[in-house]
């Protein structure tokens, strides 16, 4: 089943019993978080709050709260286990797009041409009179407080926009970038754009500030896009392919786009059937900035981007299960808000796993496996345990071929995808260890690891800014554990031989099992 827009997806989920409408008044301040958190932990449905307290816009929460709903959003209709297997097919598609195999036969060349044609055919198309612009707020009508923006946790600094797809373009790029960055509400038309330095939006902004210093930087934020576009924004799409094209491949139909209506932002294109779109700019700082609060970190001082309006963001509860520190980020000033009639506001929360990002991580884990295997054929499985805050720990299963092989794989994973830049811990195991079973992983660590020989420590590496355990914000260490069987050259001792029951005895006990009445 392919979904043209969010409403189509909501209808499909409701038909499958995967969405529940909440008609009772529920407050966006804390109550929605608590309700969504309980439902997600129970493996329950997406929630559509028809009557959010104090607001007229319905709120959609817990949309991707199970792997099955993630797969449904990518066009795969199956239960959780089958859905995860199907997501590997999407990973194989991405792998082929990222690095196509040279054709060995005429048949292979035909497949490669078919794939290239499919990508070409799924280029987005621009439409006129798009649904996302049925209603336009401008001037004094622009008031973000009218939207039911959630305050997720008691210690949060204020309401937080969480599921916005931020659309940017760098001055030297033809393709647009889609990224999901949380945004703190600080005024009727102002949000703090929390994009980390390595993310696409931040890179586009810095390049623009260098090339056009003192000029406003155009930005659009999309709320309530179709599921394929939302998931395309969190998938490791090759740089040669736009997220809109990839969404078209998932959907089986070209992504319909609309030009933004605000002068200066109209070079950006947004999904034509999105629920709500915020259009505006990051403006240069006018005059001297207000003094920083006592004890606050210093304002950005280096680089062209430092000359733009910034504000102190946070603290907010995050996917680590803790409140993060305050930091300075650019201020996004909203000039216009466009929307569909009867628009739906899409939201989420982040907290100690499991949360929605953790579920997305479980699903995207299956997409990562073929990508890794394309680069490292020795990798036989890969797992990002959700308890590891989506990406901070990885368990790698491999077919080991020589001494030192596991360490090569560690460094390969750390450097392969941007998503693994912040992975703090990597454990490498042999093929006989199930990476999804902590009991087996712990057994491998405790029986196959010598702490001095098999631990790799790397200092002064990029680390998530939210990781307060690192000694310096954004810079910390990484640790790899080689929990594989050791080869000659790695040990001078005779390696242990695993205990295994005689096959004939196992077969006899299989026959006795039913006779004894144990089945």
From Swiss-Prot:
What is a biological process (GO) this protein takes part in?
Answer: ubiquinone biosynthetic process
Pfam families cross-referenced by the UniProt entry? UbiD, UbiD_C, UbiD_N
The protein's annotated catalytic reaction(s) are:
a 4-hydroxy-3-(all-trans-polyprenyl)benzoate + H(+) = a 2-(all-trans-polyprenyl)phenol + CO2
Q: In which pathway does it act?
A: Cofactor biosynthesis; ubiquinone biosynthesis
Please provide the record's keywords in A-Z order: Cell membrane, Decarboxylase, Flavoprotein, FMN, Lyase, Manganese, Membrane, Metal-binding, Ubiquinone biosynthesis
- Lineage: superkingdom: Bacteria
Which GO terms of the molecular function aspect are on file? 3-octaprenyl-4-hydroxybenzoate carboxy-lyase activity; metal ion binding
InterPro entries, sorted: UbiD, UbiD-like_C, UbiD-like_N, UbiD_bacteria, UbiD_Rift_dom
Question: What does the record say about its membrane topology?
Answer: Peripheral membrane protein
| Main location group | membrane
Q: What's the cofactor?
A: prenylated FMN; Mn(2+)
Q: Which residues bind prenylated FMN?
A: 180-182, 194-196, 199-200
Q: Where does Mn(2+) bind?
A: 177, 243
Which positions are catalytic residues? Answer: 318 (proton donor)
Annotated cofactor note: Binds 1 prenylated FMN per subunit.
Q: Does the keyword Lipid metabolism apply?
A: no
Localization, UniProt? Cell membrane
Its EC number(s): 4.1.1.98
Write down any Gene Ontology CC term.
plasma membrane
Q: What does this protein do?
A: Catalyzes the decarboxylation of 3-octaprenyl-4-hydroxy benzoate to 2-octaprenylphenol, an intermediate step in ubiquinone biosynthesis.
Entry similarity comment:
Belongs to the UbiD family.
State how it assembles: Homohexamer.
Name of the protein described by the UniProt record? 3-octaprenyl-4-hydroxybenzoate carboxy-lyase
